[in-house]
């Protein structure tokens, strides 16, 4: 099968973020049996070594420049520029960031591949790539969008939890752009792939005529080996890219609202915020007692293995979370929110207990205290979680299911 894969996000190294992890690992599975041409865009953090490494995993790698960010303008000219971009976004029912990343050169190449019959299937790795798919393509070639997460659900979540940094803008965007956008682009594709049942329910309203496949993320079990022992102690960890709004909100929520309450009962408890690119809002948390902000680390799994519990206090964000699966694979007991545990059967009736659920301050305090004081419960969650990931959430399993959609 000749696959034309579109990924505006440069998918290497597969540790930079959730989009990179999912795209690379699905690509890695497919390349064993299929010819893959990858079209991607290079941002300033991509090194020549990254490019050379990615070339090893595809048949053809075509790299395009990522447009420069608009230069901020002050005063009225800046307001007019922002208003102009927003009006264009409303008129085209397409988010500003999607329009900004659009490359006419990529469009010309995609058009030529379809016109000349040079591919059997086109995959869009994340919905942002849908902009290159013309509605008529699906009559000539199989077109698949792997959505990763619903932008409507994501934005609505941020607004409901008060986590949006620009609530007025996001309310307008949700009402005037995003709902129309998801309806418009979902109609173009032969097949739709999502990562969770929640996202499937979002899109089944828009495309009741096709089967929407749920393919959850996986974990590279070699990169996240099961820890050899319970380290004990009182160090909690939260991992992720610390410039992402949902992670910023989660880190601040836990450090400011939950940790002080825990410290009343466990004075020695510490909270490590582990991940690259911490913003000023995250960095200032290290001034709080017991909070450690590491920035980028050489080994994420090393920090996980040194922690007694992984806390994942996400209040926003749709889609299955790599950080949850990775912590479970590494053998950490997990205390997470509904958003952190989305798509995972961790505390259902008649199933082994695989994580503890908490959404409010008192629930976090109770669950974490329970685990700190009960080594047997920690061991139970650790073993059950690892077995669950090994059975249900490997990239090989996800790749097999994705391949069936593409065929």
Residue ranges of model-derived segments:
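A short, well-ordered alpha-helix in the C-terminal region of glycosyltransferases
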Residues: 370, 377-391, 401
């Amino acid at each position: 099968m000749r696959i034309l894969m579109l990924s505006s996000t440069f998918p290497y190294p597969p540790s930079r973020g959730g989009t990179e992890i999912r795209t690379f690992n699905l690509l890695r599975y497919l390349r064993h049996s299929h010819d893959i041409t990858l079209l991607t865009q290079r941002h300033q953090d991509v090194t020549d070594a990254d490019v050379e490494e990615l070339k090893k995993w595809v048949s053809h790698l075509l790299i395009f420049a990522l447009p420069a960010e608009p230069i901020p303008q002050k005063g009225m000219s800046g307001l007019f520029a922002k208003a102009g971009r927003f009006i264009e976004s409303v008129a085209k029912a397409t988010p500003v960031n999607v329009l900004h990343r659009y490359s006419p050169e990529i469009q010309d190449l995609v058009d030529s591949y379809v016109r000349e019959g040079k591919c059997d299937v086109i995959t869009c790795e994340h919905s942002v790539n849908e902009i290159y798919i013309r509605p008529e393509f699906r009559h000539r070639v199989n077109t698949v969008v792997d959505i990763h997460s619903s932008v409507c659900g994501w934005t609505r979540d941020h607004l409901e939890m008060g986590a949006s940094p620009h609530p007025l803008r996001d309310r307008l965007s949700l009402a005037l752009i995003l709902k129309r956008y998801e309806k418009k682009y979902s109609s173009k594709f032969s097949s739709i792939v999502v990562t969770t049942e929640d996202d499937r329910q979002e899109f089944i309203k828009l495309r009741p005529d096709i089967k929407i496949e749920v393919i959850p993320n996986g974990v590279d079990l070699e990169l996240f080996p099961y820890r050899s022992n319970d380290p004990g102690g009182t160090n909690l960890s939260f991992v992720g890219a610390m410039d992402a709004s949902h992670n910023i909100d989660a880190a601040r929520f836990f450090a400011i609202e939950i940790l002080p309450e825990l410290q009343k009962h466990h004075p020695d408890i510490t909270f490590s915020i582990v991940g690259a690119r911490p913003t000023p809002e995250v960095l200032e948390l290290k001034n709080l007692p017991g909070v450690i902000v590491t920035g980028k680390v050489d080994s994420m799994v090393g920090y996980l293995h040194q922690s007694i519990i992984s806390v994942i206090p996400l209040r926003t964000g749709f889609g299955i979370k790599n950080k949850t699966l990775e912590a479970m694979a590494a053998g950490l007991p997990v205390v997470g929110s509904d958003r952190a545990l989305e798509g995972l059967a961790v505390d259902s009736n008649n199933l082994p207990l695989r994580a503890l659920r908490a959404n409010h301050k008192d629930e976090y305090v109770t669950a974490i205290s329970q685990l700190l004081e009960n080594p047997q419960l920690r061991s139970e969650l650790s073993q059950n979680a690892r077995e669950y990931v090994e059975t249900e959430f490997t990239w090989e399993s996800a790749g097999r299911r994705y391949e069936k959609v593409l065929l």
